Amino acid sequence: MSFTLHSVFFTLKVSSFLGSLVGLCLGLEFMGLPNQWARYLRWDASTRSDLSFQFKTNVSTGLLLYLDDGGVCDFLCLSLVDGRVQLRFSMDCAETTVLSNKQVNDSSWHFLMVSRDRVRTGLVIDGEGQSGELRAQRPYMDVVSDLFLGGGPADIRPSALTLDGVQNMPGFKGLMLDLKYGNSEPRLLGSQSVQLEAEGPCGERPCENGGICFLLDGHPTCDCSTTGYGGTLCSEDVSQGPGLSHLMMSEQGRSKAREENVATFRGSEYLSYDLSQNPIQSSSSEITLSFKTWQRNGLILHTGKSADYVNLALKDGAVSLVINLGSGAFEAIVEPVNGKFNDNAWHDVKVTRNLRQVTISVDGILTTTGYTQEDYTMLGSDDSSYVGPSPSTADLPGSPVSNNFMGCLKEVVYKNNDIRLELSRLARIGATKMKIYGEVVFKCENVATLDPINFETPEAYISLPKWNTKRMGSISFDFRTTEPNGLILLTHGKPQERKDVRSQKNTKVDFFAVELLDGNLYLLLDMGSGTIKVKATQKKANDGEWYHVDIQRDGRSGTISVNSRRTPFTASGQSEILDLEGDMYLGGLPENRAGLILPTELWTAMLNYGYVGCIRDLFIDGRSKNIRQLAEMQNAAGVKSSCSRMSAKQCDSYPCKNNAVCKDGWNRFICDCTGTGYWGRTCEREASILSYDGSMYMKVIMPMVMHTEAEDVSFRFMSQRAYGLLVATTSRDSADTLRLELDGGRVKLMVNLDCIRINCNSSKGPETLYAGQKLNDNEWHTVRVVRRGKSLKLTVDDDVAEGTMVGDHTRLEFHNIETGIMTEKRYISVVPSSFIGHLQSLMFNGLLYIDLCKNGDIDYCELKARFGLRNIIADPVTFKTKSSYLTLATLQAYTSMHLFFQFKTTSADGFILFNSGDGNNFIAVELVKGYIHYVFDLGNGPNVIKGNSDRPLNDNQWHNVVITRDNSNTHSLKVDTKVVTQVINGAKNLDLKGDLYMAGLAQGMYSNLPKLVASRDGFQGCLASVDLNGRLPDLINDALHRSGQIDRGCEGPSTTCQEDSCANQGVCMQQWEGFTCDCSMTSYSGNQCNDPGATYIFGKSGGLILYTWPANDRPSTRSDRLAVGFSTTVKDGVLVRIDSAPGLGDFLQLHIEQGKIGVVFNIGTVDISIKEERTPVNDGKYHVVRFTRNGANATLQVDNWPVNEHYPTGNTDNERRQMVKQKIPFKYNRPVEEWLQEKGRQLTIFNTQAQIAIGGKDKGRLFQGQLSGLYYDGLKVLNMAAENNPNIKINGSVRLVGEVPSVSGTTHTTSMPPEMSTTVMETTTTMATTTTRKNRSTASIQPTSDDLVSSAECSSDDEDFVECEPSTGRSDKSLSTSIFEGGYKAHAPKWESKDFRPNKVSETSRTTTTSLSPELIRFTASSSSGMVPKLPAGKMNNRDLKPQPDIVLLPLPTAYELDSTKLKSPLITCPMFRNVPTANPTEPGIRRVPGASEVIRESNSTTGMVVGIVAAAALCILILLYAMYKYRNRDEGSYQVDETRNYISNSAQSNGTLMKEKQASSKSGHKKQKNKDKEYYV
């Protein structure tokens, strides 16, 4: 009876449903008429929804569908374009278009679906899909209008339509039917010019025997349930047997009438049927279901527990069955012939079991049969059955996957001999034993796919929420890459202090990580008792294919599966809790790693290897993570929401520059810049070079103690020494070190892990490797070290050495990375020798430390070495006479020898080195007729090797000498680049005793010298960089005995200004007994301007150096000079700013704007700007900028580039000159005109300067990089800051580099420069620098300057004639003009009014190329009595000395280019002359050479000023008349600078800049022009 009732109910249900199907087969026929439309209720397409219909047409254009938001931004439009369907849509005014590939105007029926998923919209035509994605600010679409098919009403206002022109689009012509919003049918609101059409796919009546036709997925389908027939067309008689129609009726297979027993699962919902009250025991059973999904892995159904269970799942797109009857699991995999089952199409699964035989079939075609183990035939189930996901899929017995299912399941039925469970129907009707967890939707909805993401760069990453796992958990994902290394996943817990056996604290954390290293996948786990590292792959997994990783943990144990290969693991210790905190990082780590504790065992993290490749289907504890959405929300840089592998090799286009090696990565090229001297993505940026002289070093101090088990180290070096420390890691607490040094011309790698301190049992001491030969050849060599645990590999150029460390201890501890000198010596028994040479491109675990230190990107860098490829002269010593010598301890060179030294001399002969020994053994090095001789005797008789230099070496230039002897008794002598080699047979050992004599012998020893030794006198000259077989002696302090005149440093024989006397455009100032160099405007210091000035590095966070003048000593200036050296990569920032007292508003600012340097200043009127427009300066190279101002006139010059000039315009001076010509006799016009010109009423004074701000932090325009040698109007502010001047405050990220450089004083010869103090200057100019390590001088800053005078507390603008009481802080009554710090000062009478002070110096006019015009008559005040005249270099004065002008300023054409060591236009200086172009106030249209600086004192009263004006003008005229009358015909009565003799014709050298006066006219030497060309000085 129950069967009958059930049948009646079924019949009624089907009948009512098929009644609605008749309506669905009625379509809409559109005729293509104007103003035709069919209007449906609004479709909610805001976030997620599907729309579908079927259509047929033979036209190529027409509007199919349209909706919008009422004329604002959003719309969706479907139309036909050239016979294909076009989808246009817009969200938040961002628009895109999708065009189908398939032609549809073929008069055939086509199925169309539009799928909305937030910013993504898909278009599917007959199963072929495309999608478009928008970068909109909001992830939803606003929909206001109803939905229109076939066209739109013409009566709608165009302004109410979002898409312009939609009303003008042609209407659709054809048939449409079966319009659905998801699975529901929308209500038709109205139509116009549209007919109902009964045709359609079912119009041909394909069903026989009364079967009812309906559409299923766009195809006609027959319902035969009421006919008694079966088959596709209801043509098969059911009574003929239990065929397919019988199965369809009894099992409700694919009937549309039973589609309501469908459920959608999104990963967290699941169904559970309770079997605990009625356990099932059966010998045979059957499971049937259908599924539809995009997902590759996921649980479909599970029943049973322990050893009795059935598990059905998707595994990598195939159907997996695992069944266990208690005797062992039977596993079966069914895979399709083409593609995968996760194609979002319906697939039918049937599992049958009869005793031990198990059969599984998919879609009735693909079938697999097998047998369970042993004789167990009963399946017992007394637990719950799960449909779809489960609460913990990873913990289910036999589950091959840990993912929950995402997709649709329908008609899930379990039956055996006794029971039939229609699980889908039971869930839908809410049966008591069927529990529903989550929001299960009982219809099939579109489930968003878990799109893959692509990490395009190693720096890319995304962060995931905290993983709440304690005792158990699971993670699964797929990855795909071609790169061998990368951190895939890391999460860790709170730091904990743990103590080892020696009570050494060590910060440890619980952590969980997955990494790809050398192509293999590793799982790392630490639960508090030590780290385990599990290798999960047998072959490399970086072949570009997808790999599925499934990790399941239960307490301490678990498994990791890669594809189908399982690897079990067990954590250390007893803890079963994994205590995690904070985010989980996927693909890499953030740049700011504050708070991150990186496990030592996680090598990819320590080596900075980020993952580059694709990841998809991330499930944590069975629940999916939409990582594409997370990446979008985090705006993750370098993460792309797609995954496709480029077919073309990236290196085929040869993207790497400078001979770098190109490697193909994942959709990218990788340029290996090692050994090129460059860095960057394509190795396009030149790496910084550090020069070391044996006393210099760079030390990187780690922000915290580092522990590593893997290191990548690479760098380039160049040296002439055979010994010296290159790079080493050092620890403050242990003897741990990884050290690379030169040892006998080879690179020695020593790794020492301090096993004793941590009480480990198996350590044999340091591991040592050697590679390379004769590397002290002054050529670049590349070193690379790779350590992975116990494995070591050292590569020097092409020489490779490998080794394996003995012992279990592999952890390296270090606090510092040191180069040049090892400063951390507490645990070092033998300190390595210091390095002399050059180092470049030091990379340690992915960080380029030299450039990071130079650019200020790290704050923990001690820098004593010097930037740039420099000629290194270390520790020079001068032997002033041939009788001078010293002795050192015996030379130790028994089995082998490496000697190196540098010398410079003008003598052709002399002893350099001598050491005698046992028997006849000796060694001697001497200079004979200008050539080096190496003489020795090892016991077989004396031998001599003579250098083969191209010319004699006594040319007063530095030369390098290398002498070596190896174990094979091969001797070589290398002088500069010339090498002579000789093999000596016989004795191989050199047994020396007694003292080693340097530069000479005691007087009585010359008569007893061995044969072949030619010298009978000592060496006169300079020795430097002496290396005695790895020992660097201090020739003076280490000497056992000294005789004669021996001084530290190297003084040359020249005492007059030469073209190479001053480097870097310094000005040579000739004195009677020598010369000095004015380095003010060079940014350098030292006696020869070749030592760097005080240098500060400003970091990323910004810094400020603020100098404040004392309140009673604030200067006001008419002219200013500013110079500074810098290197930076920022596009915008303020370098220096000088401000006047509050309320005045005067300022001067040097800044970088859009990468270009410029100056803006205001002296009381408007802002005046001058800028270098030609070339950006933020290229990371070292530049020197010079700025001069005289009134409103200004010049700006960068390096030796053309000078930029600014001259104001106006008519004031023209009017004044016209007045002069009318009122004053003609012959006095010119001097008075010049005087009036200077006193123009334009504002020219920079008033009451109060402070100098360096770094830009106070203005919010931060400067990052280095500043060096800042000079402003006599103040060397950076030197003052380094000496802790009380008027200077330093804030922020500002770091002094090296030590305070000394300031040159007045010397009478070219004396030894002070020690090479550290700076940060990038230059390609090779400059000789002589240095010492002792007797460092401190800089002395003079408070006076050439153009400053205190205005005390009197703050007034330039032209305000307001009484102001001057400060009494200065007692001098004369104007003091300092030519250079420590130099002479010229004094002139004090002028009480600023407007009546005559021009101190008038300069000739010049063009924009700074050439000189005919000179003008020069006016100056009388100099003080007793002032010594200063003559041009090389010029002798045979006449009586007359008072000379205070200062004469001439412009200096730039002499250096960055890529040249030659002068462009060497000039000879006049005594005390400046070399920097300055600016003079001048009349409009006439450009003049910049003049001298002026200092203004303000008058005490207006009355005094007026009286002074009258008196001074009368006095000047009288003096002028008297002078011209008295000296008119007397040549001998005045001194004229004879400039025709000032030129020194020496060729330009590499380290000097001199200044030469131009003649006013080529005819000035003629006698008849003599009187006209005189310069008169009063």
Curated annotation (Swiss-Prot):
UniProt keyword Membrane present: yes
Signal sequence, start to end: 1-27
Domain of life of the native organism: Eukaryota
Annotated Ca(2+) 1 binding sites: D308, L325, M378
Domain Laminin G-like residues, every copy: 28-202, 260-444, 451-643, 689-861, 875-1050, 1094-1294
Ranges in the topological domain labelled Cytoplasmic: 1525-1578
PANTHER family listed in its UniProt record: PIKACHURIN-LIKE PROTEIN, SP2353, ISOFORM A
Assembly description: The laminin G-like domain 2 binds to NXPH1. Isoform 8/alpha-4B binds to alpha-dystroglycan. The cytoplasmic C-terminal region binds to CASK. Specific isoforms bind neuroligins NLGN1, NLGN2 and NLGN3. Interacts with CLSTN3.
Protein name listed in UniProt: Neurexin-3
